[in-house]
Curated annotation (Swiss-Prot):
Function: Required for rescue of stalled ribosomes mediated by trans-translation. Binds to transfer-messenger RNA (tmRNA), required for stable association of tmRNA with ribosomes. tmRNA and SmpB together mimic tRNA shape, replacing the anticodon stem-loop with SmpB. tmRNA is encoded by the ssrA gene; the 2 termini fold to resemble tRNA(Ala) and it encodes a 'tag peptide', a short internal open reading frame. During trans-translation Ala-aminoacylated tmRNA acts like a tRNA, entering the A-site of stalled ribosomes, displacing the stalled mRNA.
Natural source organism: Frankia alni (strain DSM 45986 / CECT 9034 / ACN14a)
One Gene Ontology term, aspect cellular component: cytosol
Keyword check for tRNA processing: no
Encoding gene, per UniProt annotation: smpB
Protein family per UniProt: Belongs to the SmpB family.
Name the record gives this protein: SsrA-binding protein
One of the GO biological process terms: trans-translation
Main location: cytoplasm
Record keywords: Cytoplasm, RNA-binding
Length: 159
């Protein structure tokens, strides 16, 4: 069987880009059990309530839901267990410093396969207030309307 290459998406956390200002992103590996890998191969995971936390100089992923493998037996994993993330020591130290600074958190953005290994994209983020969310939504709508109008003008269809 040929080795997998490229990036194949498993799950996205679309809500994170709405709820947080993304400052920086990192790619990390995950320490998984066999049944978790099989469940991910089936494309089943949810990042919605997930977050990462620093504990004893390591970064742990919490609340990411990987459902039990349907064909698994008593060896199945707990769906919301905490999972260790694999990063370089320098990246871990940098993240520890930035998250202890205050107001910053680590949120998962995407879970995907890269060259046959499960990877997670995490973001260093700052939470948005509700008025910031409304402002960002209004800006996005205005930009979309401008782009539509420019498209109409280029095509020669004026209102």
């Amino acid at each position: 069987m040929p080795k997998e290459t490229g990036r194949k998406s498993i799950a996205q956390n679309k809500r994170a880009r709405h709820d947080y200002d993304i400052l920086d992103t990192y790619e990390a590996g995950l320490v998984l059990r066999g049944t978790e890998v099989k469940a991910l191969r089936a494309g089943r995971a949810s990042l919605v309530d997930g977050f990462a936390q620093v504990s004893d100089g390591e970064i742990w992923l919490h609340n990411v839901h990987i459902p039990e493998y349907t064909e698994g037996t008593w060896t199945n994993h707990a769906p919301r267990r905490k999972r260790k993330m694999l990063l370089h020591r320098a990246e871990i130290e940098k993240l520890i410093g930035q998250t202890q600074e205050g107001g910053l958190t680590l949120v998962p953005l995407a879970l995907y396969w890269k060259d046959g290994r499960a990877k997670i994209e995490i973001a260093l983020a700052r939470g948005r207030k509700s008025y910031d969310k409304r402002h960002a939504l209004a800006e996005r709508d205005a930009a979309r309307e401008i782009s539509r109008e420019m498209g109409r003008r280029v095509k020669g269809r004026y209102r």
